[in-house]
Structures are given as C-alpha cells and as structure tokens.
C-alpha cells in the first residue's frame, strides 16, 4: 500500500514486487548472506583505514583522496542497492513521475507473522552497527580536520559524512516511516501512557 507524504513528496511502500518476495524463513542468529555482510562493512571500513593510515601508506594526497572517494562511492552503491535489501529487507530510491516531479520512495518488506521472519538477527545487528558507527566516525574526523586546520582533508571527510549519512537517513526513514507516521506513533504512545496513568490512579483511589 502506498502512503504519500504531501510535504516532502516521499512514499512509504511495501518492499519490491511480487517476484522478489522470497519464501519466509525463520528468524535465526546465523548469517544468511555472508558475502553481502562482508561488503556491507568492507568498503566503509577500508575507507576509514585508508584515511587514518594514508600519510604512512603514501606521500601522494591525490592518490589517497581518489582511493577514499572510490571506496566511499562503492560503499554508497552497495549499501543502498544491495546490502539493505538482503540483510534487513529495506530499500530507498528516487523516481520521477510523468510530470517531471521527483519522489523519494522508502520501502520495507512486511513480514506476514511473528513466527515467519525473513531477517536474520545477526545480519540486522551487523547492518545497523556498520550503518550508524561509520558516519559517526566521519563526523568526528570532520571536527578533527577542522580544528587541526587540515583543510585539504576536509573535502574528503565531508564526502564521507554526506554519502554515509545519506544511507543512514534513508534507511531510518525506511525503518520508521515518514514524518507523518512518526507523529502518529508519538501521539499513540503518549496517549497510551496517559490512559495507563489515569487507569492506575483510578484503581489506587
């Protein structure tokens, strides 16, 4: 079902077409997609390692910069198009309609029952840990480069923040839905808390 946010032209939809829906499997702790899990971490961790060791590995700033940007670009593509879909059943993308208007679409695979899960808990932990931790490190690198006046590295670090931050934002939107859904979730939560508190007060009195 499509839910369109009129404020920012985004859509929250069920994940993929019918032909991409695989048979539901029990949620297990084991890693079901080892290759995807490896490359989910490989490019982003490699970019961080090269950034930290670049002055020791090479005296050429251009070589280090190009290597880091290539790793960040490969990571952005792999996480956006492959690992999110396989590891956690999420995907985000953009499409332009017939009127030339751009729409952002955030997809999530809906599981039919609590017993039949398609997402491995181990893969989910790997996915979200890598997705959150690496952008945080790039933000730290950005402040470090700024305060140490390493201006030439600032552009590279900002590239890391932007590319990995974009994937983080996109997958958070896939996970929790649009701002409208967030508002309704918050309203529902506080409403339940208020009702529970009033019910408890009535029982004690």
Curated annotation (Swiss-Prot):
Subcellular location: Membrane
One Pfam family linked to the record: DUF846
InterPro entries, alphabetized: TVP23-like (IPR008564)
GO biological process annotation, one example: vesicle-mediated transport
Source taxon at top rank: Eukaryota
Bilayer topology: Multi-pass membrane protein
Region called Disordered, residue ranges: 1-21
Keyword terms: Acetylation, Membrane, Transmembrane, Transmembrane helix
N-acetylmethionine modified-residue sites: 1
Record-level GO cellular component terms: Golgi membrane
Positions in coiled-coil regions: none
Ranges that cross the membrane: 34-53, 54-72, 126-146, 152-172
Entry's family note: Belongs to the TVP23 family.
Protein name: Golgi apparatus membrane protein TVP23 homolog B
Gene name linked to the record: TVP23B
